[in-house]
């Protein structure tokens, strides 16, 4: 591969995955949904239309940037 081809491709893509357990949420009388294991799942849309889910153990956020890249953030 010659240097001009390397310049067109740009830097290699990096993936960063971070997982954090969340604090238990207050008990609510009505539940918006259940995951496969029977846990509580709350779905909502963020500012840019990304999908956010909060379960008993983890929050999962799928973000879309303006550069059409998909970022998965588990927190």
Curated annotation (Swiss-Prot):
Positions of the UniProt region annotated as Disordered: 22-43
Subcellular location: Nucleus
Additional observations: Protein expressed at very low level.
Protein's organism: Homo sapiens
Basic and acidic residues: compositionally biased ranges: 32-43
Keywords on record: ERV, Nucleus, Transposable element
Task of the protein: May possess a function in tumorigenesis.
Keyword Glycoprotein tagged: no
Domain of life where this protein originates: Eukaryota
Predominant location: nucleus
Protein name: Endogenous retrovirus group K member 5 Np9 protein
Lineage: Eukaryota, Metazoa, Chordata, Craniata, Vertebrata
A GO CC term attached to the entry: nucleus
């Amino acid at each position: 591969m010659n240097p001009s081809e390397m310049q067109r491709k740009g830097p290699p893509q990096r993936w960063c995955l971070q997982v954090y357990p969340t604090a238990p949420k207050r008990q609510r009388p009505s539940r918006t949904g259940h995951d496969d294991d029977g846990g509580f799942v709350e779905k909502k849309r963020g500012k840019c239309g990304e999908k956010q889910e909060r379960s008993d153990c983890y929050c999962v956020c799928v973000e879309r940037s303006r550069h059409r890249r998909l970022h998965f953030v588990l927190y």
